[in-house]
Swiss-Prot record:
GO BP term, pick one: positive regulation of insulin secretion involved in cellular response to glucose stimulus
This protein's name: Protein TUNAR
Annotated InterPro entries: TUNAR
Any single Gene Ontology cellular-component annotation: endoplasmic reticulum
Organism in which the protein naturally occurs: Mus musculus (Mouse)
């Protein structure tokens, strides 16, 4: 027997949480890329 939740609030909460997690993941990736760019510029600047 499968128990399913017929509650729309739970489903909406899960969708909101999923969207929130994807936004946070995207921000993390963007932050990592920006950090790498800064590290590369600092490395180039200090080696000149």
């Amino acid at each position: 027997m499968v128990i399913t939740s017929g509650n729309d609030e739970d489903r909406g909460g899960q969708e909101k949480e999923s969207k929130e997690e994807s936004v946070l993941a995207m921000l993390g990736i963007i932050g990592t890329i920006l950090n790498l760019i800064v590290i590369i510029f600092v490395y180039i600047y200090t080696t000149l």
